[in-house]
């Protein structure tokens, strides 16, 4: 693996069973030295092909490499240049020359083919989850988790977890929680994560007297218990800038699903692939419509049996479709390493 450096990388690298080379540059950019560096390392280890992630901008070195290359597509990094004159032509050339395309979902797969102007040899390998780490909590574990996070044991908890940026839709969730508070005094919207939108969201919650608690950034080791102590998980992601900004997939939906928690999602990008509408949760076509969000939350909070069924289906889907061992096999088949 050739990648960029970060603080503490040496400790991580030492614990991995494969070779990791790190550049001096904080960001990998497509320039002639990078081409030479990749070619030299590939020759040294006897590689048959190169996998480049992300496709933009780093993937632009692909056509200059001496070996075949595969590209990994996530979403926005293809959507924006795919709609800009000049950039689209360069991107299309890079995509068409690739041996294979690995897309994180149907949305980036479609964006790649739109940019290329033709079908591509694409395999969808979505974001995955460790189902042993992210698992449903027992009753006692759920009680302990709520106590750990300072959440009342009898609260109806709607959890949101993500970077706090406008397209994640937490403002709509806050507005919905404020309405629901009138009829559901035990409701609590818990928002975890950090980002530039936090100040605005806190002001909105105060103005509306909404039942919201901001946890800030939560350590990775605490995430399974945070998901597991919620009744519903939500991220009302929405499109912005005429569709140039969308949700690529939504790993948080899959993590919540693996914990057996039903999800309420906004229909943006790949979110509707991560959440099976009517099966593992609810996908809202207009995630800025507050009443639609209120209705979705009410549907799940009013029906314990429905919530339990969706939670069970969520867990099963996480095991069958999103577990790392399942996706590793799919990726290996796509790359031809099992041939």
Regions found by a protein language model. Give the residues of each.
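N-terminal strand-loop element at the rim of the active site
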Residues: 1-29, 108
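Short His-centered aromatic/hydrophobic patch
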Residues: 52-58
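A short, active-site helix/loop in glycosyltransferases that binds the activated sugar's phosphate group
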Residues: 97-124, 129-136
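Acidic donor-binding loop of glycosyltransferase active sites
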Residues: 99, 228-246, 261
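Conserved donor-binding/catalytic core segment of Leloir-type glycosyltransferases
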Residues: 102, 152-168, 174-178
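A short helix/loop element that forms part of the nucleotide-sugar donor recognition site in Leloir-type
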Residues: 135-151
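Nucleotide-activated donor-binding/catalytic signature segment of Leloir-type glycosyltransferases, i.e.
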Residues: 199-224, 232
């Amino acid at each position: 693996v050739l990648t960029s450096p970060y603080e503490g990388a040496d400790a991580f690298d030492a614990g991995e069973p494969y070779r990791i080379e790190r550049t001096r540059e904080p960001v990998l950019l497509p320039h002639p030295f990078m081409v030479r560096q990749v070619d030299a390392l590939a020759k040294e280890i006897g590689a048959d092909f190169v996998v480049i992630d992300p496709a933009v901008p780093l993937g632009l070195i692909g056509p200059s490499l001496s070996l075949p290359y595969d590209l990994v597509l996530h979403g926005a990094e293809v959507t924006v240049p795919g709609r800009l004159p000049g950039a689209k032509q360069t991107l299309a050339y890079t995509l068409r020359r690739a041996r294979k395309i690995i897309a994180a979902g149907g949305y980036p797969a479609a964006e790649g083919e739109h940019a290329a102007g033709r079908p591509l040899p694409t395999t969808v390998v979505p974001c995955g989850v460790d189902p042993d780490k992210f698992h449903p909590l027992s009753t006692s574990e759920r009680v302990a988790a709520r106590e750990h996070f300072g959440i009342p044991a009898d609260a109806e908890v709607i959890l949101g977890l993500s970077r706090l940026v406008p397209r994640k839709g937490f403002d709509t969730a806050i507005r919905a929680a404020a309405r629901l508070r009138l009829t559901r005094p035990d409701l609590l919207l818990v928002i975890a994560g950090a980002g530039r939108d936090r100040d605005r969201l806190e002001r909105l919650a105060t103005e509306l007297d909404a039942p919201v608690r901001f946890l800030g950034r939560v350590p990775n080791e605490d995430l399974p218990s945070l998901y597991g102590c919620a009744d519903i998980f939500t991220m009302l992601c929405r499109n912005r800038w005429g569709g140039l900004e969308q949700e690529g997939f939504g790993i948080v939906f899959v993590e919540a699903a693996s914990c057996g928690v039903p999800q309420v999602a906004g229909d943006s990008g790949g979110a509707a692939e991560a959440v099976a509408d009517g099966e593992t949760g609810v996908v809202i076509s207009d995630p800025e419509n507050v009443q639609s969000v209120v209705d979705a939350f009410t549907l799940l909070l009013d029906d314990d049996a429905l919530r339990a069924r969706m939670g069970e289906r969520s867990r099963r889907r996480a095991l069958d479709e999103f577990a790392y061992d399942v996706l590793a096999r799919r990726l290996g088949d796509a790359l031809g390493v099992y041939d």
